[in-house]
């Protein structure tokens, strides 16, 4: 079975990319357990709690990330450099994601056969 990586690299609510990626991830999790989820660049904002998407007339899909345990999605990484660049430290993200430096993150991403970016 091929290993599939989902890479979230865009900020939430500015486009449908994050929501569509999350939908694809949850659907794919029904077919395979060989999944990895990566949050890089502005994608780290996908995991911030307390967002108010209704202010920009967007759907609140961020809470759906909390379903990862229910879907047995436990391989999650977040780019430590992206967190530093955006001043995000000591934040309780909506998902438990392991911070990795860029080199280690690329190495981990190299273990996947298919990479889908949202």
UniProtKB/Swiss-Prot annotation:
GO biological process: tRNA processing
Pfam families, per the entry: DsrE
Keyword annotations of the record: Cytoplasm, tRNA processing
InterPro entries xrefs: DsrEFH-like, Sulphur_relay_DsrE/F-like, Sulphur_relay_TusC, Sulphur_relay_TusC/DsrF
Cystine residue pairs: none
Keyword Transmembrane: no
GO cellular component terms, A-Z: cytoplasm
Record localization: Cytoplasm
Residues making up the signal peptide according to the UniProt record: none
The UniProt record lists the keyword Oxidoreductase: no
UniProt-listed HAMAP family: Thiourid_synth_C
Primary role: Part of a sulfur-relay system required for 2-thiolation of 5-methylaminomethyl-2-thiouridine (mnm(5)s(2)U) at tRNA wobble positions.
Oligomer and partners: Heterohexamer, formed by a dimer of trimers. The hexameric TusBCD complex contains 2 copies each of TusB, TusC and TusD. The TusBCD complex interacts with TusE.
Assigned protein family: Belongs to the DsrF/TusC family.
Protein known as: Protein TusC
Species of provenance: Salmonella arizonae (strain ATCC BAA-731 / CDC346-86 / RSK2980)
Gene: tusC
């Amino acid at each position: 079975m091929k290993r599939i990586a989902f890479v979230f690299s865009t900020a939430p609510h500015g486009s449908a990319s994050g929501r569509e990626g999350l939908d694809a991830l949850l659907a794919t999790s029904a077919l395979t357990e060989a999944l990895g989820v990566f949050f890089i660049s502005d994608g780290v904002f996908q995991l911030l709690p307390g967002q108010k998407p209704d202010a920009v007339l967007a759907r609140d899909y961020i809470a759906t990330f909390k379903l990862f345990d229910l879907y047995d999605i436990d391989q999650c990484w977040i780019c430590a450099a992206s967190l530093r660049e955006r001043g995000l430290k000591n934040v309780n993200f909506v998902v438990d994601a392991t911070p990795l430096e860029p080199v280690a993150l690329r190495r981990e991403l190299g273990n996947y056969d298919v990479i889908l970016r949202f």
